[in-house]
Amino acid sequence: MKGSVRALCAFLGVGALGSALCVSCTTVCPHAGKAKAEKVECALKGGIFRGTLPAADCPGIDTTVTFNADGTAQKVELALEKKSAPSPLTYRGTWMVREDGIVELSLVSSEQSKAPHEKELYELIDSNSVRYMGAPGAGKPSKEMAPFYVLKKTKK
């Protein structure tokens, strides 16, 4: 099992350190036996994904999501060309991979630390990109809109 996970991590370009993290995650991950969940988890660990998501009241929202290897996450949003929201909003929380391979983030705004956690879903497209799917139950973006909801992996 560990050899196949190493091979998968190598295929995804995770590297030796990431491969070691992936192998170790399979021993504690509740979805360790699920190949799709393992693939998603290996691709996301330590990854930073960025893009501009559509918005109704501005040209877009510059979005950066960080999936830390310890299961914590951070999301930073900045509304483009919007004078009423000039500073970025920062959310912190946790992430997990569901059995179906969908990534679920549980986030709370740093300004509202006592507020309930917001849940967001992401779909792994390939080892270098994820698609924002919104809140649970919202459904995937339409085929025409799907390309506008993609975040690409960045180096830092």
UniProtKB/Swiss-Prot annotation:
Asked if the keyword Lipoprotein belongs to this entry, the reply reads yes
Native source species:
Treponema pallidum (strain Nichols)
Tell me the name of the encoding gene. tpp17
Name the membrane topology term.
Answer: Lipid-anchor
> Could you identify this protein by its name?
17 kDa lipoprotein
Claim: Lipoprotein is one of the keywords in the record: yes
Q: Where is the lipid attached (S-diacylglycerol cysteine)?
A: C22
Principal location listed in the UniProt entry:
membrane
List where in the cell it is found: Cell membrane
Covalent lipidation (N-palmitoyl cysteine), chain numbering: C22
Alphabetic keyword roster: Cell membrane, Lipoprotein, Membrane, Palmitate, Signal
Can you supply one Gene Ontology CC term for this chain's record?
Answer: plasma membrane
**Signal peptide (from-to):** 1-21
The source's superkingdom equals Bacteria
